[in-house]
From Swiss-Prot:
Membrane topology category: Single-pass membrane protein
Name of the protein described by the UniProt record: Coiled-coil domain-containing protein 167
UniProt main location, coarse: membrane
Key words, A-Z: Coiled coil, Membrane, Transmembrane, Transmembrane helix
Parts forming coiled coils: 10-79
Gene Ontology annotations for the cellular component aspect, listed alphabetically: membrane
Localization, UniProt: Membrane
Entry's transmembrane regions: 77-97
Length: 97
């Protein structure tokens, strides 16, 4: 996803979207695997399904890598939010005394 698009979406929404894409990709992969294991196929049909399977596996791998990065970014954002909250709490407590 481009940096411009990322700025418009929240990290949590991006994670949700990628999880949906990954889930769909895994379902498609299961369908391809069941077709490969099922009926006798011609060598051309088998090659086509193997190619599709490879493509889906690469896509799933890329989605997983991007999800990992987004989760790390989300974790950093959460820690930053907690740090700001604690800082404001300390400032308020000092001011209130």
């Amino acid at each position: 996803m481009t940096k411009k698009k990322r700025e418009n979406l929240g990290v949590a929404l991006e994670i949700d979207g990628l999880e949906k894409k990954l889930s769909q990709c895994r379902r498609d992969l299961e369908v391809v695997n069941s077709r490969l294991c099922g009926v006798e196929l011609s060598s051309e049909a088998r090659r086509s399904l193997e190619k599709e399977k490879s493509s889906l596996m690469n896509k799933a791998s890329n989605y997983e890598k991007e999800l990992k990065l987004l989760r790390q970014e989300n974790r950093k954002n959460m820690l930053l939010s907690v740090a700001i909250f604690l800082l404001l709490t300390v400032i308020y407590a000092y001011w209130a005394l």
